[in-house]
């Protein structure tokens, strides 16, 4: 933060300082200084009301703190002024998908893919829409394009002290345990691994704990098989062993 403040104190024109202002506002949000971050973004947008990065980062801040309706409005404003930028379409689509507004989400993912046919996050979102609608073949096609080479992502850490690095295993097509209520982002630095699309050659982020969030063996067999292989040689504790989850399917339960 001090480095950004020092850059803003330099005698540069305001246009040249704008990216630094946006970075500083986003950092305030990451530090959980919500009020200051929001005020900083509002000040920037008062001067630059159509600036894409400012709108997009402000929408991301609002969504991260649960102001979903406000975030949707900000993303929609970004789309209004930048209709061919796929990122705002994807961000708005993701929020609409969370609200089970699948038709509207699909429209935005389609717009993103029209602008950029290889956009990984748009393929991931479209796959989720199709999966929820029961179109497994269509979902797999989009998931393959969206997650191959993009199977590992890291969530923001909002704590003050050193985090506990954690690996969270998930399935691409749903059937995952909701973890937000207990994987505190002020305690854990969480790297999410989409197990069924992880290239074995991809190095895993540093971690001291693995949490398997894949919970439906009937829906997620390929992901569980990949999770079993991934954890077989792990030297760190594994919570919710994928081998045990695999044995809890309807067929296994019926056999017992």
Where are these regions (language model features)?
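Conserved N-proximal alpha/beta basic substrate-recognition cap immediately N-terminal to
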Residues: 152-165, 170-256
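Short coil turns that delineate tetratricopeptide repeat
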Residues: 12-15, 49, 83, 117, ...
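Helix-start (N-cap) detector for alpha-helical repeat units in TPR-like alpha-solenoids
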Residues: 18-19, 52-53, 86-87, 120-121
């Amino acid at each position: 933060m001090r480095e950004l403040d020092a850059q803003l104190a330099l005698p540069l024109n305001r246009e040249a300082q704008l990216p630094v202002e946006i970075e500083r506002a986003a950092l305030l949000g990451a530090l959980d200084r919500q009020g200051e971050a929001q005020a900083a973004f509002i000040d920037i947008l008062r001067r630059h009301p159509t600036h894409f990065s400012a709108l997009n980062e402000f929408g991301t801040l609002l969504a991260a703190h649960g102001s979903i309706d406000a975030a949707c409005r900000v993303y929609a404003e970004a789309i209004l002024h930048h209709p061919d930028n796929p990122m705002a379409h994807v961000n708005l689509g993701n929020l609409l998908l969370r609200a089970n507004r699948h038709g509207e989400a699909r429209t935005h993912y389609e717009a993103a893919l029209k602008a950029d046919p290889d956009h990984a996050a748009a393929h991931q979102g479209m796959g989720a829409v199709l999966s929820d609608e029961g179109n497994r073949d269509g979902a797999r096609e989009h998931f393959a394009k969206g997650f191959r080479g993009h199977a590992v992502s890291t969530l923001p850490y909002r704590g003050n002290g050193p985090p506990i690095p954690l690996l969270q295993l998930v399935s691409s097509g749903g059937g995952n345990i909701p973890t937000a209520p207990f994987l505190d982002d002020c305690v854990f630095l969480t790297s999410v691994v989409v197990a069924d699309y992880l290239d074995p050659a991809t190095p895993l982020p540093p971690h001291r704990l693995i949490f398997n969030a894949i919970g439906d063996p009937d829906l997620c067999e390929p992901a569980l098989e990949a999770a079993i292989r991934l954890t077989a040689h792990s030297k760190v504790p594994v919570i919710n062993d994928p081998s045990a989850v695999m044995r809890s399917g309807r067929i296994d339960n019926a056999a017992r």
